[in-house]
């Protein structure tokens, strides 16, 4: 009689443990699904912000280039500015596909061309603007998180 109770209690404990393990697995899979959904939402928000920033930068760069080119410049200076603007536009477009961009950079540029994309004057102008935008985006991301 005593043996029957021990077997019955052991069976109940084993079945309860099996149910708890199964419930744990289900809750973990549900958590994984929720985490994946939240990551997708974060990525979509980031993509929208990045798209807006890219659009802003493209417009600002075009305006800056047109203003810069309207001044009296030599044809060589204008050509150099347009080359730089095209390089920046390619960089902005490559933000969507960083793997392809790195391959293009390796094929299309040498190190000297990359180093000489901007002159000192342009760096003085664009540096503070980019740092301000970075600060604003950092603040937005901090508020979202």
From Swiss-Prot:
Propeptide: 19-43, 74-124
A biological-process GO annotation: killing of cells of another organism
Protein known as: Maximins 5/H4 type 1
A single GO cellular-component term on record: extracellular region
Positions carrying Leucine amide: 144
Organism: Bombina maxima (Giant fire-bellied toad)
Tissue: Expressed by the skin glands.
Signal peptide: 1-18
């Amino acid at each position: 009689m005593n043996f029957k109770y021990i077997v019955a209690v052991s069976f109940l404990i084993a079945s309860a443990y099996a149910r708890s393990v199964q419930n744990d697995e289900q809750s973990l899979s549900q958590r994984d699904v929720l985490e994946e959904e939240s990551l997708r939402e974060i990525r979509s928000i980031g993509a929208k912000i990045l798209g807006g920033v890219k659009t802003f930068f493209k417009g600002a760069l075009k305006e800056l280039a047109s203003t810069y080119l309207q001044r009296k410049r030599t044809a060589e200076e204008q050509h150099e500015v347009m080359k730089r603007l095209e390089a920046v536009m390619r960089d902005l477009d490559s933000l969507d596909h960083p793997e392809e961009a790195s391959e293009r950079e390796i094929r299309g540029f040498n190190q000297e061309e990359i180093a000489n994309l901007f002159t000192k004057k342009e760096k003085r102008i664009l540096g503070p603007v980019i740092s301000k935008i970075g600060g604003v985006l950092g603040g937005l991301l901090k508020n979202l998180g």
